[in-house]
């Protein structure tokens, strides 16, 4: 039987300060799983040096690194969807490039998947380096979302997760423009297990989630999940 393959999907938007260090840690984590793997970067319209660095990585690591690029900024959720559309793996792992979600947790996620989980989602026990305002609004948002949803959505989670291929295939059949991965994952009803962790501070640079983008994501989540 052929060994199962893993796809790591990383949306990128103006991340030249952290990209190369992030790649080193991501690649080390994927190698530690012992599985064949691919790392898929989706450039979400960056206009700094991000794309140049991505081209360098693809040229230096042609067997494992693949790069796709949008003509403009379409948003995090559509960038993730693009990566999923092109992924070949038996399991798909979604992670942000900024190293707040430690790549070193990936081998543990893979082990939980091999033990039977269809979805392994990161559950944040603590959020380092975030302002009181950000922590408070996040807490209010997740509880509001949970109270309005027609189905249970785990609290204090983001898009850091592993999806079995069958889960990804169902997700990709749903082509809504306003996408909300964590809610859609919960709605599908597959076996999902949490992996608890402490979310780190950003390794470099600033968050690209402006207040406007956060409000839009919140609205998408509430409208997609409400009964």
Q: Language-model segments: what does each one mean?
A:
Residues 1-131:
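Structured catalytic core of nucleotide-sugar glycosyltransferases
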Residues 16, 30, 117, 148, ...:
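A general structural signal marking secondary-structure boundaries and capping sites
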Residues 56, 68-86, 100-184, 200-219:
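Acceptor/aglycone-binding surface of glycosyltransferases and processive sugar-polymer synthases
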Residues 187:
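Flexible glycine/serine/alanine-rich "lid" or loop that lines and gates the nucleotide-sugar donor pocket
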Residues 219, 223-227:
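Alpha-helical membrane-interface segments at transmembrane helix boundaries
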């Amino acid at each position: 039987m052929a060994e199962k393959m893993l796809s790591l999907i990383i949306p990128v938007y103006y991340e030249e300060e952290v990209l190369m260090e992030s790649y080193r840690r991501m690649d080390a984590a994927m190698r530690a799983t012992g599985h064949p793997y691919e790392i898929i970067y989706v450039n979400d319209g960056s206009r700094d040096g991000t794309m140049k660095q991505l081209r360098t990585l693809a040229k230096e690591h042609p067997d494992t690194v693949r790069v796709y690029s949008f003509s403009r900024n379409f948003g995090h959720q559509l960038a993730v969807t693009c990566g999923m559309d092109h992924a070949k793996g038996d399991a798909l792992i979604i992670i942000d490039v900024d190293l707040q979600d430690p790549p070193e947790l990936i081998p543990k996620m893979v082990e939980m998947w091999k033990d039977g989980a269809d979805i392994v989602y990161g559950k944040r026990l603590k959020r380092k380096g975030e302002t009181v305002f950000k922590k408070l609004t996040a807490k209010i948002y997740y509880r509001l979302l949970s109270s309005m949803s027609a189905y249970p959505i785990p609290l204090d989670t983001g898009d850091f997760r592993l999806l079995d291929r069958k889960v990804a295939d169902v997700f990709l059949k749903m082509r809504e423009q306003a996408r909300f991965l964590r809610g859609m994952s919960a709605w599908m009803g597959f076996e999902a297990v949490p992996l608890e962790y402490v979310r780190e501070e950003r390794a470099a640079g600033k968050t690209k989630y402006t207040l406007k983008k956060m409000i839009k994501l919140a609205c998408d989540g509430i409208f997609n999940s409400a009964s």
